[in-house]
Amino acid sequence: MYKRQANEDGDLLTKTRLTQIGRDLLESILGINQITIAAVHGASAGGGACIPTACDFRIGTENCIIGYPEVKLSMNLSWGALPLCYNLVGPAITKRMVIGGELEQAEDLFAWGFLDETVPADKLESRSTELAEFYASRPALAAQMIKRGVNALQMANAGIMHMDGDQNALATLSEEFQEARDAFLNRKK
């Protein structure tokens, strides 16, 4: 309720601080010393798609769908997720996913490099565990150093994304956002 109220009536400071919570979450995931693996079953959208984007590996079921539908609410992708998506799939697919705002199919996500693997739904937990055990069996210090190095390379340009929270807060003031939000909240359930 607090977040919805802030989006309706809150000032820019409140809105940017709320967006910072998501950025802090993704930075925390990136900063975990151990290897992180997202196991995606069903739909993963918006913030739910940003979380696996920040993980080291992503395994999805053959019928999972993932997307960033923020644009449909006249909002940009925030939380610092844009460079993470860009580094996974490149500029053209990032634009397709973020500007298009559609939920993408597992087959395409795998072909683009967003998903590392797809498995039948009944194999998701066992395959995720198998992969976790594999990486956990590697020398911890070396794995941690490699992960930190790769993340540093991956995020070399992320500093320019400081403004995504401000852009997001500003976008929520637009008439397009108000109309899209009202349509979303009033849709038939």
Residue locations for each model-derived region?
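Well-ordered beta-strand positions
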Residues: 57, 96, 100-102, 108, ...
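C-terminal long alpha-helix characteristic of the crotonase
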Residues: 59-64, 115-162
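CoA-thioester-processing core
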Residues: 24-31, 39, 45-98, 112, ...
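Glycine- (often His-adjacent) and acidic-residue-rich active-site loop
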Residues: 1-27, 44, 74
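A general structural signal for well-ordered alpha-helical segments in protein cores
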Residues: 22, 82, 91-94, 142-146, ...
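Helix-loop "lid/cap" segments that line or gate small-molecule binding pockets
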Residues: 97, 109, 149, 153, ...
